[in-house]
């Protein structure tokens, strides 16, 4: 049995306010817990996959228990809001849904999207699997590249940079595994 008064320091900030979403990412265990929830996975499994462990499994589980105990007093975090949307929100029918930066959606966020698209006539999904930056929170570009059937359009010219940056980016890109093959051109300038 946890002594919640003693464990409270785990989820309170230095000025004694209840932790907010930003705080969960400052605490290693709560960040891993949030990643597990975003991946729709067992937190212990995600903990075991982590190569660097700042807390023991016992401390990890205690922090989760304490965090959830304090949230019972009508506190929710961002991940809770997404989970509630899946179960509690009836999304209205839409003519068009446009989703951008889709490479950074987590499995939990995709669950909401799957529910929304049931009532959508046309979906536009935009993103670049080479630009995924939220893997730390459970995002995986493979969901973006494989979920929606239909026509896929790859833009063949970037307007962001010229030849030198294009060449350098292609060297880096070759090191990205499971990336959709793209051949694109660049602006007529050096930078």
Model region roles, listed by residue range:
Residues 12-98, 107-112, 135:
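Accessory N-terminal region flanking or inserted into the helicase ATPase core
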């Amino acid at each position: 049995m946890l002594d919640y008064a003693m464990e409270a320091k785990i989820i309170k900030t230095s000025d004694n306010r209840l932790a907010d979403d930003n705080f969960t990412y400052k605490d290693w265990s709560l960040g891993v817990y949030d990643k597990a929830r975003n991946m729709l996975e067992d937190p212990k499994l995600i903990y075991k996959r982590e190569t660097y462990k700042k807390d023991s499994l016992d401390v990890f589980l205690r922090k989760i228990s304490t965090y959830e105990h304090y949230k019972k007093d009508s506190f929710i975090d961002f991940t809770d809001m997404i989970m509630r949307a899946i179960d509690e929100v009836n999304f209205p029918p839409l003519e068009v849904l446009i989703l951008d930066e889709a490479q950074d959606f987590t499995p939990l966020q995709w669950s909401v999207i799957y529910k929304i698209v049931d009532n959508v006539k046309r979906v536009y999904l935009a993103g670049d699997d080479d630009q995924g930056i939220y893997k730390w929170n459970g995002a995986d570009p493979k969901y973006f590249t494989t979920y929606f059937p239909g026509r896929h359009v790859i833009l063949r010219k970037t307007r962001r940079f010229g030849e030198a940056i294009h060449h350098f980016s292609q060297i880096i890109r070759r090191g990205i595994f499971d990336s959709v093959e793209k051949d694109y051109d660049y602006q007529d300038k050096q930078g």
